[in-house]
């Protein structure tokens, strides 16, 4: 949904309680061996992601954030993952966690903090959900998105593209226009950030093309009229930089060859 769940945990909770943060994308996990490793008797075997996290964090009480719990597949392999996660979150068992690479060695995970995120609660295993304290997060209001844009997203993007704060100025109406017309009415700010990144990236490319020392200009697929730094972004420039031009060589939709 893009309403800042990961950021809240990584930049908020982890820093507030001064614990290392580790991220695991459950949508990309193929089976339980990803977490608890393979037996050392197999060629090329390795310990699992949980042990990796403990090694990297150099402590036994990190925050382990499992993202997109509702994306775990409903296949047999997915059930294996759910069973392992159920074991990890059981206070009576998680002090005796074992990685297949280290048979017989008990790993105490009882001090670790496990946090899960999901968008569709109906797709979360009932037994696993029963072990959780569920906190519902809401989407942002337009004024919240503008504040997040000005205070966090724009400073981060300006720093990424090595612009000064005064180099690119977004009018408030321009940001409101992006939110209303280019973000598909999302509850979070993921598409808003993507749009702002596209705009600033194009400005950066255009600026580099104009300052190119070679006589031959770099050909671009877009134009920025009256370009100069500092540059003010209004609604007209938003439309120009975010417009999707049709590819004349692209075959019509639903046409098969």
Task: Walk through the language-model features, giving the residues of each.
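Walker A/P-loop
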Residues: 1-26, 55-56, 86
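A short beta-strand-to-loop transition that corresponds to the Sensor-1 phosphate-sensing loop
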Residues: 67-69, 90, 111-121
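AAA+/SF3 P-loop NTPase mechanochemical coupling elements
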Residues: 57-61, 97-117, 166-170, 226-233
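AAA+/P-loop NTPase substrate/partner-engagement loops
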Residues: 15-46, 53, 73, 144
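Conserved catalytic/switch belt of AAA+ P-loop NTPases
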Residues: 68-107
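Conserved C-terminal "switch" segment of AAA+ ATPases
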Residues: 58, 120-130, 134-194, 205-224
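Short regulatory helix/loop adjacent to the ATP-binding pocket of P-loop NTPases
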Residues: 77-78, 101-102, 107, 119-132
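C-terminal engagement/docking regions of AAA+ P-loop ATPases
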Residues: 190, 195-257
């Amino acid at each position: 949904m893009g309403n800042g769940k990961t950021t809240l945990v990584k930049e908020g909770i982890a820093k507030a309680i001064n614990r290392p943060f580790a991220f695991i994308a459950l949508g990309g996990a193929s089976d339980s061996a990803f977490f608890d490793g393979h037996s050392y008797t197999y060629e090329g075997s390795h310990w699992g992601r949980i042990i990796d996290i403990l090694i990297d964090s150099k402590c036994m009480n990190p925050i382990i954030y499992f993202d997109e719990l509702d994306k775990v597949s409903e296949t047999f392999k997915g059930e294996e993952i759910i069973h392992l996660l159920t074991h990890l979150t059981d206070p009576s068992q998680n002090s005796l966690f074992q990685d297949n690479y280290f048979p017989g060695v008990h790993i105490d995970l009882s001090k670790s903090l496990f946090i899960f995120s999901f968008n569709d609660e109906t797709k979360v295993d009932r037994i696993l959900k029963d072990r959780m304290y569920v906190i519902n997060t809401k989407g942002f209001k337009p004024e919240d998105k503008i504040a997040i844009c000005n205070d966090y997203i724009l400073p981060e993007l300006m720093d990424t593209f090595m612009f000064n704060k005064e180099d690119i100025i977004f009018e408030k109406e321009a940001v409101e226009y992006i939110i209303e017309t280019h973000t598909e009415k999302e509850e979070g700010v993921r598409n808003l950030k993507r749009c702002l990144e596209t705009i600033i990236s194009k400005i950066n490319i255009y600026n580099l093309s104009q300052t190119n020392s070679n006589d031959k200009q770099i050909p671009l697929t877009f134009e920025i009229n009256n370009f100069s730094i500092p540059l003010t972004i209004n609604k007209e420039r938003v439309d120009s930089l975010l417009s999707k031009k049709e590819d004349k060589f692209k075959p019509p939709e639903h046409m098969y060859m």
